[in-house]
Amino acid sequence: IVKRFAEYFCEHIISGINFSVDGKKVDPVDPLLWNQKGTIQEYGPLPVPGYPGITLKIADVLNTEGHKASYQKQGGYVFRCNRLIVGSLVNGDKITGFWNVDPHWRGVRWQLNYDASHDVDLGTTTRKDDIAPKQELMDKIREIVMPIARECHRREKEQGIIKTKDQTEQLVKNIKSVANDPLITRTISSKGAL
């Protein structure tokens, strides 16, 4: 329950409201890692054009300190009245025109915040735990998110190539180091003599 509270009410906790469960203080779990070292705050929080009261922010969390960008946590997060109601949105039943779950997009996160006055625009369910947004609104969000997401994706791929090259160079150094180790050389020589 503490983990759920930390995720669902992270915006309230970040704003200074304290929660505790069985006497244990609940720390926020912000899916955008907005204020963490290494997070690139790409956009926002800014209003979605034509929808005052709906704000959007986008982050690149690939190099966020102490966090490995999770494959499953990529995509969008929707908060109603500062409470998370839907997370990890990618192409699927609720939204289209974004990206499918892919390791090269794992660092891209976006967050949509809205209040109860926009329940119709977001198609908020009566239980306030899911959405079926209007296509016009999703088109506007996509127009903002996707160019930034593509740039994050490009950086991710470049960084992956660089890492791969660096990792290969390190592997070669390790092999050379092992090959020149006198103890290993003697062991190989003695086994060869058998």
What is the role of each PLM region?
Residues 21-45:
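Active-site-proximal acidic segments at structured loop/helix or strand boundaries
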Residues 38-194:
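Charged regulatory segments coupled to nucleotide-binding catalytic modules in large multidomain enzymes
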Residues 1-24:
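ATP-binding catalytic core of ATPases
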